[in-house]
Swiss-Prot record:
One of its GO terms (cellular component) is hemoglobin complex. It comes from Varanus albigularis. InterPro entries: Globin (IPR000971), Globin-like_sf (IPR009050), Globin/Proto (IPR012292), Hemoglobin_b (IPR002337), Hemoglobin_oxygen_transport (IPR050056). Keywords: Heme, Iron, Metal-binding, Oxygen transport, Transport. Residues 2-146 form the Globin domain. The gene is HBB1. Red blood cells. This is Hemoglobin subunit beta-1. Heme b binds at H63, H92. The major hemoglobin component (HbIII) is a tetramer of two alpha-2 chains and two beta-1 chains.
Length: 146
């Protein structure tokens, strides 16, 4: 994947402003609410019975932070995302058996959450750069499935 200097700047400058715990928790909660079938991967998280329960679930928040911390690793390694996610791809495929479509769904929710938090600062150029990034990340996470 080729990243322009502008894309790298847009991604990195916005990422430096986010609260990984807050955005991660909201992103994972959004995935579980909007796409309820994804909850089967997280049944051990306890109460996922309603949007309020999901949003307030400390395990959802903690795992969302973990997910976005890994996403931050991709941002630090934009030119080597596939290798950055090689072990996570193996884990999600071989051990956790996550449907690889869920990676793209999570990425799309992340873009929405970022847009919600950053308002007018999240320009169409930011949207395009982050959409490209989540597509590359989801493809890298799904790599082991191919």
């Amino acid at each position: 994947v080729h990243w322009t200097a502008e894309e790298k700047q847009l991604i990195c400058s916005l990422w430096g402003k986010i609260d990984v715990g807050l955005i991660g928790g909201e992103t994972l909660a959004g995935l579980l609410v909007i796409y309820p079938w994804t909850q089967r991967q997280f049944s051990h998280f306890g109460n996922l019975s309603s949007p309020t329960a999901i949003a307030g679930n400390p395990r959802v928040k903690a795992h969302g932070k973990k997910v976005l911390t890994s996403f931050g690793d991709a941002i630090k390694n934009l030119d080597n995302i596939k290798d950055t996610f090689a072990k996570l791809s193996e884990l999600h495929c071989d051990k956790l058996h996550v449907d690889p479509t869920n990676f793209k769904l999570l990425g799309n929710v992340l873009v929405i959450v970022l847009a919600d938090h950053h308002g007018k600062e999240f320009t169409p150029a930011h949207h395009a750069a982050y959409q490209k990034l989540v597509n590359v990340v989801s493809h890298s996470l799904a790599r082991r499935y191919h």
